[in-house]
């Protein structure tokens, strides 16, 4: 009986520590989701602002090219649809999110074009990407889902953006900015989806469907 009473304080402390860790983990998820939502909205605004400067024929042509082309970050293996996203582990979603954010650290600096509003946005984006990367890394470190086995594709470095755009023609600057902004918007939407699903899983909500 004495041993039981001795164990009770230990169990209570352990329970409080576990609850504290869960609360802190949820706080970090809330911050990460909020920041990527802001980045996604910012990316959407920047793309819409740039798209609004294009002539109708120019817009249609660039949209056709983008649909046939690919983003630099497409080499990062990620879920192809909602079903695969929901089947992925929390740790896998965090790792993919980290890779996607990391892939934009350099390209985000080249989003600066003539519009002064976009200059301010681009500077803001670089800082927010860096903060979000740190936050996701903390979530990965604190994840209890086990060890993720990364395949060979995950360990490969992305091709540099300089090579990605080196073959563009005379209208390269317009196409380059269009593709950068469109890809950035697409990737921020991916990260927002992955972090939202991961956060829901960690909060033990009954329904985490997309």
UniProtKB/Swiss-Prot annotation:
A Pfam family annotated for this UniProt entry: Hormone_1
Residues annotated as binding Zn(2+): 38, 192
A molecular function (GO) term: metal ion binding
Subcellular location as annotated: Secreted
CDD domains: somatotropin_like
Keywords: Disulfide bond, Hormone, Metal-binding, Secreted, Signal, Zinc
Disulfide bond residue pairs: 71-183, 200-208
Broad class of where this protein is predominantly found: secreted
Gene3D superfamilies registered for this protein in UniProt: 1.20.1250.10
Domain of life: Eukaryota
Coiled coil segments of this chain: none
A GO biological process held by the record: response to growth hormone
Signal sequence interval, chain numbering: 1-22
One GO CC term, this protein: extracellular space
Recorded family membership: Belongs to the somatotropin/prolactin family.
Described purpose of this protein according to its UniProt entry: Growth hormone plays an important role in growth control and is involved in the regulation of several anabolic processes. Implicated as an osmoregulatory substance important for seawater adaptation.
The protein, known as: Somatotropin-1
Organism from which the protein derives: Oncorhynchus mykiss
Lineage of the organism: Eukaryota, Metazoa, Chordata, Craniata, Vertebrata
């Amino acid at each position: 009986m004495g041993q039981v009473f001795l164990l009770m304080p230990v169990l209570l402390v352990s329970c409080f520590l576990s609850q504290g860790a869960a609360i802190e983990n949820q706080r970090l998820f809330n911050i990460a989701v909020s920041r990527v939502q802001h980045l996604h909205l910012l990316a959407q605004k920047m793309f819409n602002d740039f798209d609004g400067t294009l002539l109708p024929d120019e817009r249609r042509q660039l949209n056709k090219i983008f649909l046939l082309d690919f983003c630099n970050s497409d080499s990062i293996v990620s879920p192809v649809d909602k079903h695969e996203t929901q089947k992925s582990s929390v740790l896998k979603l965090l790792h993919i999110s980290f890779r996607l954010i990391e892939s934009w650290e350099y390209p985000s600096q080249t989003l600066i074009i003539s519009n002064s509003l976009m200059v301010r946005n681009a500077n803001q984006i670089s800082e927010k990407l860096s903060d979000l990367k740190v936050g996701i890394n903390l979530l990965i470190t604190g994840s209890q889902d086990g060890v993720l086995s990364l395949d060979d594709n995950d360990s490969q470095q992305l091709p540099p953006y300089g090579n990605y755009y080196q073959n563009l023609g005379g209208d390269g600057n317009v196409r380059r900015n269009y593709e950068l902004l469109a890809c950035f918007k697409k990737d921020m939407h991916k990260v927002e989806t992955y972090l939202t699903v991961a956060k829901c899983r960690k909060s033990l909500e009954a329904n985490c469907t997309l």
